[in-house]
Each structure stands twice: as C-alpha cells, then as structure tokens.
C-alpha cells in the first residue's frame, strides 16, 4: 500500500516526465541581408517537422566571410527582426551576438544547451553544406548537441556519415550577394526581400557602395 507521500511523488514524477521538450529550429547565417529564401526555408522546416519555433541566429563575426563585406551585426539583427515580426513561428536568436567574436556553431550550441538543457535543437543547413560537415569545428561533439536538418538540393546526395533529417523545400535561387549587388547598382530588390527589410536598407543607406 502506497503512502500519500509516495503517491504524490509518483504523480509529480509522471507529470515532469510527461512535459514535452521544446523543439526549436536554428537557422544560422550572416543575413547580409535576410531574404525570402531564408523565410521560405524556415517555414517549410518548421511546418514539416512540427517545431515549436524556428530561430534566426545572425553571426556576430563569421569565421569564413570577408569582414569588409559584412555590415554591422546590429543592422543585420534589426533586418532579421523586421523580416520575421509578423510570423509567430519565428524568433530572433541573439546567442552569437551576445557571445561576440568569431561564430563557431559548436561553441554557440553548447552555450544554448547549457541555458536550455530541455530544448531539442534542430540545426538547419542547405543540402550543399552537408558534404562539408566533416570540416566543421568539433563536429563529433556538435552532433550530440543538435539534430541536423538538410534542405534537399538538386545534384547533391541525401546521404551523410552524420545523422541528418532531410526536408523538401521550394528551391528559391536568391542570394544575399546578388541582392547587395543589385542595391549597389540602384536596381530593385522587390520580391527578393520582405518590404520591411527593403525599407530598412533604404532608410539606413546600406549596400549603396559596390562590393
């Protein structure tokens, strides 16, 4: 026969066990600037995997990008916020901005898991990047912290030595480099970036000089 305390303990344990972990997608990038391709990818992953939210995580100082072509992280974060403000699935993740310095995914995800140990993270990358996972910093430790989500790309295999969930999403041939070049030449970027992002770029005179 169980005592009241034993019964209460059992109920509490079962309740705690039944609490589902939050399932959060992470889309990292320079977002220089964010464009509709980013939003479509994030929406498709969130919907298909049933995630609680998808967070856009701007790099503070990208390890593999020419710093001369990367505008201030504050502007990039502000543009992300403008791009996602009307979508309840999306959030801005500032972990790499808070940490500062060069952004390595392993260090950032270790930081996030320490803050939110009960959150299950899904790290979203293009299918063209999956082949290069073996070159990522501390990849063997990183795969213990996150589940990788690969966006299928034509011409790239859907296999990997690492665990990857593959997702189909519309292929939108938009690049931030292309957008910067168009702006620097005075061309329209309508339908390439959200209207709020285009307005922010114009207001702050971003990318007006040639790359």
From Swiss-Prot:
InterPro entries: Cyt_trans-like, NadD/NMNAT, Rossmann-like_a/b/a_fold. Pathway: Cofactor biosynthesis; NAD(+) biosynthesis; deamido-NAD(+) from nicotinate D-ribonucleotide: step 1/1. It is an enzyme of class 2 (transferase). One of its GO terms (biological process) is NAD biosynthetic process. Pfam families: CTP_transf_like. GO terms for molecular function: ATP binding; nicotinate-nucleotide adenylyltransferase activity. Gene3D superfamilies: HUPs. It catalyses: nicotinate beta-D-ribonucleotide + ATP + H(+) = deamido-NAD(+) + diphosphate. The keyword Transferase applies. Its EC number is 2.7.7.18. Keywords: ATP-binding, NAD, Nucleotide-binding, Nucleotidyltransferase, Pyridine nucleotide biosynthesis, Transferase. Belongs to the NadD family. Catalyzes the reversible adenylation of nicotinate mononucleotide (NaMN) to nicotinic acid adenine dinucleotide (NaAD). This is Probable nicotinate-nucleotide adenylyltransferase. It comes from Lactiplantibacillus plantarum (strain ATCC BAA-793 / NCIMB 8826 / WCFS1). The gene is nadD.
